[in-house]
Amino acid sequence: MLRDSAGGPEVFLVRRHEDTAFMGGAHVFPGGRVDAADHEGTDAWCDGTTHAAAQLRDLPPADAVAYHVAAARELFEEAGVLLARDAQRRFVSLTGDDVHARFKEYRDAVHGGRYSLRTIVELQGLRLALDALVLFSHWVTPPVDSRQFDTRFFMTRVPPDQTPAHDDTETTHSCWLTPAAAIAQSINREIVLPPPTWTTLRELESFRTVDDALAWARTRRILRRQPAMLMRDGIRMLLLPGDPLHPDPFDDEAPRETRFVLVDRHWHAEASDRKSP
């Protein structure tokens, strides 16, 4: 999720709870897994189902739409942002004490499984805006990892009249940072950035506006990135496609840093010499 600032686009990051089994304590983008309810009757309460299916042509249309619904639901649960429009196609405003309190209750209810996101959207006479989500990346966990994830990353602009905040349950802190500032804080060991988050921030670093970033995302070629895990001299390394030590060392679109070294729970990014291992 992005917003414009005087210093360029800023990205919304949440800090995962320390006790979370996967990436505990790391700063990440809001997100999570697809639930069964994310597949249900989407045409009745969602706009942009055709857009969603077109963005994920490698999946059956129903699964492609469910990925988008899950992204919107997780954004509401973890950041309190609702990508939904009213009958005039205006994004719902969450300003005002009464409105804020009501949607805080809705958020807690969705998070706790008492309500579905569909229930909230239909109760308020809204439509979920799947067309506001732009696919820009596809990551798969290394084959040796005990937890396997196949993750699609989406980009969106924070709607007007909505203020994101972490949920104080799965996430314990949130912040807006420019990509450069987030990377600098990671280098200084102030925050932990997982390799996919670091790589995404590096890709966003050069854009001057959110419109520029969204335009890039809409036209880029989506590559399936599956890092490889390597232990060398007792040091854990994560190698991206394009790194000379990766099984697929040839990737014309490989990011600047293709190698991440884990030291004391912090990932350190390294630019490798792609001509030799």
Where on the chain are the PLM-derived regions?
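N-terminal leader/linker segments that precede catalytic domains of diphosphate-processing enzymes
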Residues: 1-277
